[in-house]
Swiss-Prot record:
Biological role stated in the UniProt entry: Ion channel inhibitor.
Keyword vocabulary terms for this entry: Disulfide bond, Ion channel impairing toxin, Knottin, Secreted, Signal, Toxin
Disulfide bonds listed in the record: 54-67, 61-72, 66-79
Compartments it resides in: Secreted
GO cellular component: extracellular region
Protein name in UniProt: U3-theraphotoxin-Hhn1j
GO molecular function, one term: ion channel inhibitor activity
Expressed in which tissues: Expressed by the venom gland.
Annotated family: Belongs to the neurotoxin 10 (Hwtx-1) family. 51 (Hntx-8) subfamily. Hntx-8 sub-subfamily.
Prodomain positions: 25-52
């Protein structure tokens, strides 16, 4: 009886240890692509998009006018593409 309890305990402890090791290695692998992508797509201050004088698609149009090709929705106050029934 004692040997069976000890072997079950050791088996359970081994499975827990295996789970912890696998989880740790998987979390390290997940960080690597994030770091690589962030270094590839790092945006320099010179290349940042400048603030426009007009609001683009699905942007609020309360204070800014919509860019060309968009109209301000009277209901939602967003810039949307003009629909045929609105003309």
């Amino acid at each position: 009886m004692v040997n069976m309890k000890a072997s079950m305990f050791l088996t359970f402890a081994g499975l827990v240890l295996l789970f912890v090791v696998c989880y740790a290695s998987e979390s390290e692998e997940k960080e690597f692509p994030k770091e690589m992508l962030s270094s590839i797509f790092a945006v320099d201050n010179d290349f940042k998009q400048e603030e426009r004088d007009c609001a683009g698609y699905m942007r609020e149009c309360k204070e800014k006018l919509c860019c060309s090709g968009y109209v301000c929705s009277s209901r939602w106050k967003w810039c949307v593409s003009p629909a045929p029934w609105r003309r």
